[in-house]
Amino acid sequence: MAAPYDVQQVEAYWRHRWETEGVGRVDLDAVDPSDVFVNLVEYPYPSAEGLHVGHVYRYAGVDAYGRYQRMSGTQVFQPIGFDAFGIHTENYALSVGEHPVSLTARTTARFSRQLSRIGCAWDWTRVIDTSRPDYYRWTQWILVRLFEAGLLYRAEAPVIWCPSCLTVLAREQTERDGTVCERCESPVIEKVMTQWFLRMTDYADRLLAGLDDLDWPERAKRLQRQWIGRSEGTEIAFGDLIVFTTRPDTLPAVTFLAVPPGHPAAGGARPHPMTGAEIPVFEADYVVEAYGTGAVMGVPAHDERDRRFAMAQGIATSHAELLDPQAAAAVGAPAVRYRLRDWLISRQRYWGPPIPIIHCAACGPVAVPDDRLPVLLPEIEDFRPAGTGESPLASVHDWVATTCPSCNGPARRETDVSDTFVDSAWYFLRYPSTEFDDRPWDADRTAKVLPVDFYAGGPEHVQRHHLYARFMTMALHDLGLVPFEEPFPRIRIGGLIVKDGAKMSKSRGNVVTPDDYVGTVGADALRCGLLFSAPWEQGGEFTDAAIAGIERFFAKTRRVITGPDREGPHERTLGRSIHAVTDAIERFTFNVAIARLMELLPEVGSADSKRIFVRLLAPFAPHLAEELWHRLGEPFSVHTQPWPQSAASSDDELVDIAVQVDGKLRGSITVPRDASERNTCEVARREVSAVPAVATRVVYVPGRVVNFVTGGR
């Protein structure tokens, strides 16, 4: 009979021992640069009462990968922190009637407890909190450097305003073609305001070109390319109205011009550059002022959208002959345009780092000197957004009034704060240097440890945080402040875990907290239950049935590992399993790795196979593996042991199988060469979402293809 296993006691004991003995921590001064592996996941917003299991799904996968890397011989640096400043936390504070200062202290403490209890190998000695002065001092320092370089500027421009959040938004913070706020989903409006921008468009070509060399999912790279939106075309003058087009050959068929709502040319007319005929100018919602020149040609004969608009407005259609390439090239000037706009970073809110600029009537905008940083955020009782276009800080008159650093004359502080995405655009640079209070990052430490070797994030950040961080790193590199241009050479995007068929959210009432499970079945069961639910990059449905299945697997594991030794498994079987688990981890199909462990367990009998099995289990169930390693009489810790190796060739043992549904290719899987039809079908159902749970029949060609026939067409 297996020894009793008190999951709460066991997990608490090993977590305490890992922390006190520094398992997983890296001496960044002593480590060889070739050995260090930075394993980073996007830090959370502490803008709720705690984590939900969707967070655990993402973190557990990253932690499993980090533990595998450590056992494979690298020195894994895996820090964590809190994206505590910004609208997410402030809106939550407003909703619960608590000041952001006290709320952030409370929520980060709770998040820390939860992050610790799920068993991830965080380096708790290097936690960052973006709302602390020792962090945002350096956010402000970076903005000063960018201001001095001409990359931070203030200008009047049409901006996106959220009437609900009562602040401007960057275009990247809108959804549904720029019509709603990504945070509150309220319709947004356009205003003309004076705001602070970063010259991200100066880096458009480099941001595009750099994507080619990054190990990112193709979809993520495609989304960034689309967002940057480089177009080569022609600028054509209709009088004083300049139009950008990629189809200059259609110029003879132009019957109207379209501009965005509110454009001063709307309602007038402009001369056709070829005929001199007056072409009417219409307002059209589909024209984006920030793209091209803000005016487009209307060619109903050659564009379906233009045709529909012309019919609605009663505009004639011309079927004039298209220009030949030579004539088309002569009608205007070649031009390159981008969808990307400069990054609007100022916010009319309270909870953020004050932008470190002083306004002087004589000197203009002046950067706050380094020795006066940080510009501390004053604690005010009424932090609600005013909705007037000014931050609540504008009402703190004693704080606003100051002297000019250049002429010592009377001046006033900038009252806008910088957006939370400025904080996260550089946070990875701070992690290795948290002990330095006289610099944002140590040059030698940064060159040794960074860039990030592996970064995991969510799909919602591909066109926001990931893009901003790339721009920021390139800009800092150009200023000679960091030795690399790309912060995240390798990224993987975690899928979403859903409950009751929908993404977890408080509004849907389907949020599941990890505490509900860690306090009963334990962190290991929750981690493995989540990772077993679906391929990590794909995501899937979270069910209690998966947790129950993992509990049964764990109980059997304890019986086998602590039971008497016996023969087995065959060396080839063990070798195939090592290869399969290793390959699955490398592919981030942790569900396949756990399934392979389940298949291997009944074969485990010898003392050597038990030690190998426990090491294979360690990345997924770290507490259980540590306890079983201890019960086998092995030295602490299993997580510092070498990853199991096999002499067999993985090329000989594994094959790729095409997965079809009704004869159409839906994906592929990797299985052992001698996998049975049943096991192959199980892997296909887990890994390929299009595979039905029930099929009329299955056609299986060993080593080549499996086709699920549903009878549909």
Task: Specify the residue positions occupied by each region the protein language model found.
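N-terminal, positively charged nucleic-acid-binding surface of large information/translation enzymes
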Residues: 1-260, 300, 312, 472, ...
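Amphipathic alpha-helical
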Residues: 200-231, 252-266, 371-403, 613-642
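Basic, alpha-helical terminal appendages of large translation-related enzymes
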Residues: 1-34, 296, 316-322, 331, ...
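Active-site-adjacent bridging/hinge elements
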Residues: 33-41, 115-119, 277-287, 428-450, ...
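Structured ligand/cofactor/substrate-binding pocket environments in proteins
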Residues: 54-66, 83, 135-138, 154-155, ...
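Conserved phosphate-binding loops in nucleotide/dinucleotide-binding enzymes
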Residues: 94-95, 102-103, 170-201, 243-244, ...
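Short Cys/His-rich metal-coordination motifs, predominantly Zn2+-binding knuckles/fingers
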Residues: 165, 182-186, 275, 361-363, ...
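Helix-rich, typically C-terminal accessory recognition domains appended to large enzymatic cores
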Residues: 144, 148-165, 238, 245, ...
